[in-house]
Amino acid sequence: MNRLPPVALVFLGGALGAIIRWTLTVWIPALGDPTRVLGAATPLNIIGGIPLGDIALLVVNVLGALLLGLLVGMIPDSAHPRRTFWGTGVLGGFTSFSSLAAAVDATTDSASTILIGGTYGVFTLALGLIAAAMGLRLGRDLNELARLRRAADGADEPQDPHEPHKGGAR
């Protein structure tokens, strides 16, 4: 992975993320009604006026925000190849703001459904921000824990050869 140029990492990761998102947003609604034809809305695949495909998109976007926060917390270097592949690539392809906008637009096609669509959009954004903050906090905590473990093992930073080794955690 370290040998690929960043554009290749983003391309490959984005393709993988988009395929995973598409799979989840197609197959989660099918779980609500296994007999349904793809794209057909039946009473079994609608919850509170929102199609299960849009619920699946909400899950995908919130999960993606959580994972991106976790990744950023664990790998602070934005140019790191793993962060480029997993963050910009996979999670960038996995989450979809444009699909969210289309879902809100489709849900607000009449005056009676504007409240449902608007609530869905605001709820998705709020949950995404909360999930990203939680992921970022968890990622930073995990990164700090790993740093402390390396320090306890004496492998955190190269030691100054002129300074005597004190042993143990610093």
From Swiss-Prot:
The keyword Acetylation does not apply. One of its GO terms (cellular component) is plasma membrane. Keywords: Cell membrane, Ion channel, Ion transport, Membrane, Metal-binding, Sodium, Transmembrane, Transmembrane helix, Transport. One of its GO terms (biological process) is cellular detoxification of fluoride. One of its GO terms (molecular function) is metal ion binding. The chain crosses the membrane at residues 8-28, 55-75, 84-104, 114-134. InterPro entries: FluC. It is a multi-pass membrane protein. It is found in: Cell membrane. It catalyses: fluoride(in) = fluoride(out). It holds the Pfam family CRCB. Fluoride-specific ion channel. Important for reducing fluoride concentration in the cell, thus reducing its toxicity. HAMAP family: FluC. Belongs to the fluoride channel Fluc/FEX (TC 1.A.43) family. This is Fluoride-specific ion channel FluC 2. It comes from Corynebacterium jeikeium (strain K411). The lineage of its organism: Bacteria, Bacillati, Actinomycetota, Actinomycetes, Mycobacteriales. The gene is fluC2.
